[in-house]
């Protein structure tokens, strides 16, 4: 049976070595294996994503709850729940519904309906993996079409989402993969508090020049456990991409944005003023794999040796952005 949520431990993330042939621990809600050649354990809680790891040994991103978990399926949604948290995931073939916008709308309507009918009504964090995310011109660019489908789903299933606060989220591009949209998320019985970045226009308020529908996510969420979940963050000030072609400057600007979110969360007493440490996780998506060594060196210079870092090859939502970074930090 799921554990008693009144005695819940904090939700937590880690990067762990791949252990084939061994079952996951009973408190694992979700595990994400990256790379087409990395084996995925035979466990429903394991999701395989075709983004290549760029540094170090293959590893699994593991999200742990309070355990033991119960797994199940509801329509297209697979899930694991522990009494306090729920992890869900689904995939949908674009061809089955026509195009990416329609596939995204269908996927999000399914997951939002599932969450509305479950006791875990509050979605804290979402990840979206989109094939060829930068393909297409103008409003036909695939990321813009993804945003259109997502916005339509929120409007249909959760009209008050902006007032409540959109979940923190990332959307990155897979390369050379079948056109299958993959979405996973973490939800809870307890609401989180969304945090916006004073250096940036909120994504859901972007002007029309970025597409027919604004991206519907918040810059960060702080959970009821004081876990700061920073969305995929890049070199954007206001709503404008900065430092085109300059990776070092983009990294600098990205960390200014992450620091601003940490500072706001601390100022509002949502988290304690603690630095990133061995209990935090940092994931960086890098457009050009040949930059992996220099980026790893720079991240270590900034973060020190103890902060777990995962570097993945991926396309970023805007074609002029070279890197995107997300963080989970227990404050």
Segments predicted by a language model, with ranges:
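N-terminal presequence-like segments and the immediate start of the first folded domain
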Residues: 1-256, 260-280, 285-331
């Amino acid at each position: 049976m799921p554990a008693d949520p009144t005695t819940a431990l904090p939700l937590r993330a880690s990067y762990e070595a791949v252990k084939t042939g061994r079952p996951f621990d009973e408190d694992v809600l979700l595990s994400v294996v990256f790379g087409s050649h990395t084996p995925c354990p035979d466990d429903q809680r394991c999701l395989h994503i075709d983004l290549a790891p760029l540094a170090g040994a293959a590893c699994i991103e593991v999200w742990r709850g309070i355990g033991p978990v119960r797994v199940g399926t509801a329509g297209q949604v697979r899930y694991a729940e522990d009494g306090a948290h729920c992890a869900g995931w689904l995939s949908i073939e674009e061809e089955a519904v026509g195009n990416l916008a329609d596939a995204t709308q269908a996927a999000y309507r399914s997951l939002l309906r599932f969450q509305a009918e479950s006791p875990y009504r509050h979605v804290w964090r979402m990840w979206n993996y989109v094939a060829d995310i930068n393909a297409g011109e103008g409003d036909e660019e695939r990321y813009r079409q993804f945003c259109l489908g997502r916005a339509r789903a929120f409007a249909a299933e959760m009209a008050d989402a902006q007032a409540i606060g959109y979940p923190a989220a990332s959307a990155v591009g897979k390369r050379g993969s079948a056109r299958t949209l993959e979405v996973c998320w973490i939800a809870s019985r307890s609401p989180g508090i969304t945090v916006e970045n004073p250096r940036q226009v909120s994504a859901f308020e972007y002007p029309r020049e970025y597409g027919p529908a604004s991206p519907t996510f918040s810059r960060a969420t702080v959970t009821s456990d004081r876990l700061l979940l920073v969305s995929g963050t890049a070199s954007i000030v206001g709503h404008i991409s900065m430092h085109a072609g300059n990776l070092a400057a983009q990294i600098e600007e990205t960390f200014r944005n992450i620091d601003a979110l940490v500072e706001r969360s601390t100022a509002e007493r949502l988290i304690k003023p603690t630095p990133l440490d061995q209990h935090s996780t940092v994931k960086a998506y890098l457009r050009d794999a040949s930059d992996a060594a220099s980026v790893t060196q720079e991240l270590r210079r900034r973060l020190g040796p103890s902060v777990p870092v995962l570097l993945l090859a991926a396309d970023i939502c805007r074609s002029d952005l070279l890197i995107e970074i997300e963080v989970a930090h227990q404050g």
